[in-house]
């Protein structure tokens, strides 16, 4: 096969909703030397576009990252083959927008649905809310150690968790977020109207080691992952949880609490108005620290967790039982769900991301694909709000990478913008969040919250 002269029969098609991006369904011949740019020129010519639209191309569901010649060679096909080539809008580079300075390492980030406010959890033990100009709107103090996870519950509540082994529910104010009728009824019932913004609404106790991950469902439930190998299942409705007596915990001689921890607990008890609650249940099956837990985005009675014990577990939250376990060959540190694709993306200590289908039976090791490109632990994952195939990952190698799961290599790599960052010294990324109206937010060891463009990245 001569690459410069040979041609191959192709048929272009697209699943784009915009009818103006649809070409006529007519087969044509194209040089097999063409790559993405050349194919994009052909499609734009067929569309008669005044302003060229950048496209990506897929053949049999696989992103084309080489020439047509190389693709045919890889698949063992001749130029006499006929190819159905799908085209889709290309993702634009996630250009740098802004950075905010924090007092200490930033471990966790969140943005409420439809909100333009960022919340961060820091190793200095403080939760902060930020506007997009980098101004701190509010600080929430109460944890007695580093914070490892933060999440919005509603526009008047958020939850945090940390190394002090507790979760805290906080009163906040975010006018960008709207309450559901259930949330409004709950807050009216709990008489939170008179509680000051920034105050702790409740302390949730039950874990025996640092709590490093939390997730929130739309039915007033919280999941927490802990280094005590367990997962906590909680409610934001106080009357559904058992009251905890902190004095019983402190005075129990069999309880292995350090002297310093006992002193801290007694200090926090000075505010007798703070509710203390126990979990609805503790889910136990992991044999090593649990790194992250999430709700199924389409069924809040199901949860997924990953652990240093190399497993992905599926949980029935109604019965509090593990119903499926997948075993890998490496510690798993992060997880995100691509719900429309029925896939779980899992970041590992082996530096790659694996894609698993939770519907497939656990009798065999099932790995759909590995995304390879990071050079250190993959500590955080989040999905693109605009495209079901796109996700981003944060790593201890100091980068955030943007992936299309139809390709095994990253589309883009985001590096730390702060000039004081030293590679391998203070560049670890601990958290990423891809938020609509904000962008790709990342943070970590450099004490910076960095924002890169991630909104409207499929538009010209």
From Swiss-Prot:
Classification via CDD domains: WD40
Major location category of this protein: nucleus
Keywords, comma-separated and alphabetical: Nucleus, Repeat, Ribosome biogenesis, rRNA processing, WD repeat
An example Gene Ontology CC term for this record: nucleus
Annotated region (Ubiquitin-like (UBL) domain), positions in chain: 8-89
Annotated localization: Nucleus, Nucleolus; Nucleus, Nucleoplasm
Molecular-function GO terms, alphabetical: ribonucleoprotein complex binding
Per-repeat ranges for WD: 101-140, 142-180, 206-244, 285-325, 327-366, 373-413, 424-460
Stretches for region Sufficient for interaction with ERB1 and association with 66S pre-ribosomes: 99-460
InterPro entries: G-protein_beta_WD-40_rep (IPR020472), NLE (IPR012972), WD40/YVTN_repeat-like_dom_sf (IPR015943), WD40_repeat_CS (IPR019775), WD40_repeat_dom_sf (IPR036322), WD40_rpt (IPR001680), WDR12/Ytm1 (IPR028599)
Gene3D superfamilies: YVTN repeat-like/Quinoprotein amine dehydrogenase (2.130.10.10)
UniProt-listed PROSITE patterns: WD_REPEATS_1, WD_REPEATS_2, WD_REPEATS_REGION
Pfam family of the protein (one): WD40
Residue ranges that the Swiss-Prot or TrEMBL entry lists as coiled coil: none
Reported function: Component of the NOP7 complex, which is required for maturation of the 25S and 5.8S ribosomal RNAs and formation of the 60S ribosome.
Miscellaneous: Present with 6670 molecules/cell in log phase SD medium.
Protein name, per record: Ribosome biogenesis protein YTM1
Source species taxonomy: Eukaryota, Fungi, Dikarya, Ascomycota, Saccharomycotina
Gene coding for it: YTM1
């Amino acid at each position: 096969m001569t690459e410069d002269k040979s041609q191959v029969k192709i048929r272009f098609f697209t699943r784009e909703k915009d009818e103006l991006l649809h070409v006529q369904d007519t087969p044509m011949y194209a040089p097999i030397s063409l790559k993405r740019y050349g194919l994009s020129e052909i499609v734009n010519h067929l569309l008669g576009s005044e302003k060229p639209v950048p496209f990506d191309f897929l053949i049999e569901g696989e992103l084309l990252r080489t020439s047509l010649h190389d693709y045919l060679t890889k698949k063992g096909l001749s130029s006499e083959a006929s190819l159905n080539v799908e085209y889709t809008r290309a993702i634009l580079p996630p250009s740098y927008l802004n950075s905010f300075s924090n007092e200490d390492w930033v471990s966790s980030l969140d943005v409420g649905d439809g909100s333009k406010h960022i919340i961060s959890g820091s190793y200095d033990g403080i939760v902060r809310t930020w506007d997009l100009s980098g101004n701190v709107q509010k600080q929430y103090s109460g944890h007695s150690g580093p914070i490892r996870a933060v999440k919005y519950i509603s526009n008047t509540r958020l939850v945090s968790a940390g190394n002090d082994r507790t979760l805290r529910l906080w009163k906040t104010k975010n006018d960008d977020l709207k309450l559901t009728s259930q949330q409004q009824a709950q807050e009216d019932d709990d008489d939170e109207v008179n509680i000051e913004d920034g105050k702790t609404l409740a302390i949730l106790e039950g874990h025996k080691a640092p709590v490093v991950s939390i997730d929130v469902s739309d039915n007033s439930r919280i999941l927490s992952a802990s280094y005590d190998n367990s997962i906590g299942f909680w409610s934001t409705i106080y009357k559904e949880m058992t009251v905890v007596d902190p004095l019983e915990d402190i005075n129990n001689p069999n309880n292995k609490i350090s002297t310093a921890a006992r002193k801290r607990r007694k200090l926090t008890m000075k505010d007798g108005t703070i509710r203390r609650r126990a979990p609805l249940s503790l889910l136990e099956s992991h044999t090593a620290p649990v790194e992250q837990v999430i709700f199924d985005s389409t069924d809040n009675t199901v949860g997924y967790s990953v652990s240093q014990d190399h497993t992905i577990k599926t949980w029935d939250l109604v019965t509090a039982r593990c119903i499926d376990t997948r075993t890998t060959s490496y510690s798993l540190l992060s997880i995100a769900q691509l719900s429309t694709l029925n896939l779980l993306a899992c970041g590992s200590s082996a530096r790659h991301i694996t894609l698993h289908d939770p519907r497939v039976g656990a009798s065999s090791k099932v790995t759909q694909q590995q995304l390879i490109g990071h050079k250190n632990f993959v500590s955080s994952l989040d999905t693109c709000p605009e495209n079901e195939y796109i996700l981003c990952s944060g790593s201890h190698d100091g980068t955030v990478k943007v992936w299309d799961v139809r390709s095994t290599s990253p589309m883009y790599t985001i590096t730390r913008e702060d000039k004081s960052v030293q590679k391998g010294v203070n560049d670890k990324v601990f958290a990423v969040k891809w938020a609509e109206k904000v962008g790709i937010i990342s943070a970590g060891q450099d004490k910076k919250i960095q924002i890169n463009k991630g909104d409207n990245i499929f538009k010209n």
